Amino acid sequence: MKLHELKPAEGSRKVRNRVGRGIGSGNGKTAGKGHKGQNARSGGGVRPGFEGGQNPLYRRLPKRGFTNPTRKEFAVVNLEKLNRFEDGTEVSPELLLETGVVSNAKDGIKILGNGKLEKKLTVKANKFSASAVEAIEAAGGKTEVI
């Protein structure tokens, strides 16, 4: 094989389809837009969700729910992430932020019981799941709600 015999891989190069450039191209005259009407015009077309004047789906269905203005969002930490600390460490939200376990404390920290805890720790957080409290105390540690 020589340099002048190199060819691009099959299907790697697609020729751009130039519409409205002669009837022989197969996309001349109306350029694939059909005859007249809203969709044939420049900038034409209907907005998303428009159903031709029929009452659209988003208006046929009833409204549901509301946005709770006092919603609290907690940063979640699983037990397995706490194994990085030494035995006897007091794990506080400040320590979790410092060590990068959580990047944003949001409205507080909630400890969940996913994974296995092998260290004896004193954990301070805003919320605990029941399984997390059980696992921390089983490992000989303490939980403290702040």
Swiss-Prot record:
GO terms for biological process: translation. Keywords: Ribonucleoprotein, Ribosomal protein, RNA-binding, rRNA-binding. Pfam families: Ribosomal_L27A. InterPro entries: Ribosomal_uL15, Ribosomal_uL15/eL18, Ribosomal_uL15/eL18_sf, Ribosomal_uL15_bac-type, Ribosomal_uL15_CS. The keyword S-adenosyl-L-methionine does not apply. Gene3D superfamilies: 3.100.10.10. Residues 1-13 have a biased composition (Basic and acidic residues). The keyword rRNA-binding applies. GO terms for cellular component: cytosolic large ribosomal subunit. Residues 1-65 are annotated as: Disordered. Residues 21-31, 42-52 have a biased composition (Gly residues). One of its GO terms (molecular function) is rRNA binding. Belongs to the universal ribosomal protein uL15 family. Binds to the 23S rRNA. Part of the 50S ribosomal subunit. This is Large ribosomal subunit protein uL15. It comes from Halalkalibacterium halodurans (strain ATCC BAA-125 / DSM 18197 / FERM 7344 / JCM 9153 / C-125) (Bacillus halodurans).
